[in-house]
Amino acid sequence: MDNCIFCKIANGEIPTNKVYEDEVVIAFLDMSQVTKGHTLLVPKKHIQDIFGYSSNDASAVFKRIPLVANALKDAFSDMQGLNILNNNGEMAYQSVFHSHVHLIPRYNGESDGFGLKWEPAQEGTYSDEDLKNITNTINQQIEG
């Protein structure tokens, strides 16, 4: 993609703070640094979002997450946890439409402005029958 910032980074047209690169992915520090070490793992191949991945692409890209995650853990002894996020579509807060995975280190006692919290549905919102119907609908799509 000609105007894709992540394609330009992957092609070496835009400099970045690269932490890892191979033939499939590039990983670099997010410019916003929600927390120290906030890293993006980006496929070099332009894939818009999770819905554009083949099984082979997904396997090749996502199997590299532990490598970067462990590097973050080893690099920052004060890291207490790690959020791994993949936003897909504008409604899900995807702002760069080239698939990427956020690895966001979390530190004890840090008020970093990052939050990930959702409220469970109110009791009774979904009956057992509703849940069975939802399950069947998804299963039908998986089974073809």
Positions of PLM-derived features:
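HIT superfamily nucleotide-processing domains
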Residues: M1-G144
